Regions:
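Long lumenal/extracellular ectodomains of secretory and single-pass membrane proteins
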Residues: 1-318, 328-495
Length: 495
């Protein structure tokens, strides 16, 4: 009876009435499946989800936290990490102290500043001071320095809280405000941060040596103030003569400024892109890291109305950018194709010579309506049944990128979309392709499957790095999570 009660109590419905689950039956897996999709959620909601995971298994929860922040091997989620780290410092400070020295390694030095005013403040300031002294010593010997000075707050900043933090740090370092400021100036000069050049209107720097975020963030300043040299650099990037760093950029960052539902033509969904912007976008997109797959996999992209609800980033931007990226980098038989769905599914073959051409083309198919994922499964099954397609020619895997607020099943509203699709395929002599449910906006606590379902995994976030993780990963939700966080990269992270 207890198991029946648990099963019944775990039932809920999506915003569109589809039967689904409140939880995967693991709080850690619930967090893993959504931690990359919480950017629009409140601090309190983020904390509540982490508290449950931390209570279930502290070590797993801590590894999940650092995986979420990891800008090189994980999801690159900054705000969620800082919210949780601040909560931990106030409630479980020992878990923070054990991992303080790893924060900058997985993220940035300024992530540590969220610990100001917490029981971990003193230890955090000591970590900063130790690195600061190492950098000053290295500077005296004309050596390399860390990026600490780039991220430390300035005492002459315009924001009052930033100034207060800077003064507190200077005091802990044993420096006057003036000495602290001079030290930062010297260290930042050694780092050669591009902001110094822009402030002084000095455009003699080497574009090929600038970090990816800065290159994209300041592209309009380059166009405006150094158009000839910047244009020449972009041409050399396109011919392979120069390298443009884009290793920490996510595809949505190139799509987000230009994709629009409100304020654009309903037929295009695109804002105007200038000729100079086109050159910059095309070169940057071509320079993104390549996460390829050789499997017969196809991405399924949700373009329903809720994907355009106000959020930063817009879920539709994330989904469309990932769909376009994956289709281009897919080396299987579905290369340059993906399925877009809302009221009905559309198989889209990507056309266009450049990124801007291709983005504009695929955006023109957007149908901002309901969330009929059942029709996607029906399209694949009908195509197979009517043409006697053997199992091995079906997609081996479907990567469904969505906010998971699916419509209810038309023929059996009491079944979840996953179970309904599974039953339909089996009734016609087929096995349902493996499914990756990729959440890009977790507004509600609900999950499409539970932890021990076979042939399915749950992921979340904006990074294409997940494509390579799910290619050869264990196709069981809980086992896949463990496979990711038990990687050697997170071995040293403990509670």
């Amino acid at each position: 009876m207890l198991n029946y009660l648990k099963k019944e109590a775990n039932k809920t419905v999506t915003e569109n009435g589809a039967v689904t689950h409140i939880t995967t039956e693991s709080d850690c897996l619930d967090l893993f499946a959504t931690i990359g999709a919480l950017r629009r959620e409140s601090d309190q909601e983020i904390e509540a989800r982490f508290i449950r995971a931390y209570t279930e298994n502290r070590d797993i929860a801590m590894k999940l936290l650092f995986f979420a922040r990891d800008i090189r091997g994980g999801l690159g989620e900054r705000r969620v990490f800082k919210v949780i780290l601040n909560w931990l410092a106030k409630n479980e400070p020992q878990s923070v102290r054990k991992n303080l020295t790893y924060v900058a390694e997985y993220g940035r030095f300024d992530d540590l500043l969220c610990l100001m005013g917490t029981p971990c403040e003193k230890e955090m300031l000591s970590v900063l001071k130790e690195q600061f002294e190492k950098d000053r010593l290295s500077l005296e010997n004309s050596g390399e320095v860390s990026l600490l000075a780039k991220w430390l707050p300035s005492v002459n900043a315009s924001n009052a809280q930033t100034v207060r933090n800077a003064k507190k740090i200077a005091k802990h370092f044993g420096l006057s405000d003036a000495s602290y400021r001079k030290a930062l100036v010297a260290l930042r000069r050694q780092i050669r941060i591009i902001e110094n050049n822009l402030r002084e209107k000095d455009y003699t720097f080497d574009y090929s040596k600038q970090p990816s975020k800065a290159m994209y963030k300041y592209r309009k300043a380059f166009m405006r103030n150094d158009s000839e040299r910047y244009g020449d650099f972009l041409k050399k990037v396109s011919t392979g003569e120069e390298k443009l760093h884009a290793d920490t950029l996510a595809p949505y960052e190139l799509v987000e400024p230009y994709l629009s539902y409100h304020g654009s033509s309903d037929s295009t969904f695109m804002r105007k892109i200038t000729e100079q912007e086109k050159d910059s976008l095309n070169a940057t997109w071509a320079s993104l890291p390549k996460f390829e797959t050789k499997e017969n996999v196809i991405a399924v992209i949700d373009t329903s109305g809720s994907m355009y609800w106000d959020a930063k980033p817009l879920p539709a931007s994330v989904a469309l950018s990932l769909g376009l990226y994956f289709a281009e980098n897919n080396t299987g038989i579905y290369k340059n194709h993906f399925i877009e769905f809302s009221r009905k599914p559309q198989l889209i073959e990507i056309k266009g010579e450049t990124f801007v051409d291709r983005l504009r083309y695929v955006a023109s198919f957007n149908e901002v309506a309901n969330t009929n994922i059942e029709a996607v499964f029906d399209l694949i099954l009908k195509s197979a049944v009517e043409n006697n397609v053997p199992q091995e020619e079906l997609p081996a895997k479907l990567i469904i990128i969505s906010d998971m607020e699916f419509d209810c099943c038309v023929e059996n509203a009491k079944m979840s979309n996953f179970n309904n699709a599974k039953a339909k395929f089996e009734a016609n002599g087929y096995k349902l392709p493996e499914i990756v449910f990729w959440n890009v906006a977790s507004r509600n606590r609900q999950q499409p499957v539970t932890k021990n379902e076979q042939g399915v995994v749950l992921v979340s976030g904006c990074t294409p790095r997940l494509f390579s993780m799910v290619e050869s990963g264990n196709m069981n939700p809980y086992a896949f999570m463990l496979e990711v966080i038990e990687n050697e990269r997170y071995a040293k992270i403990v509670a």
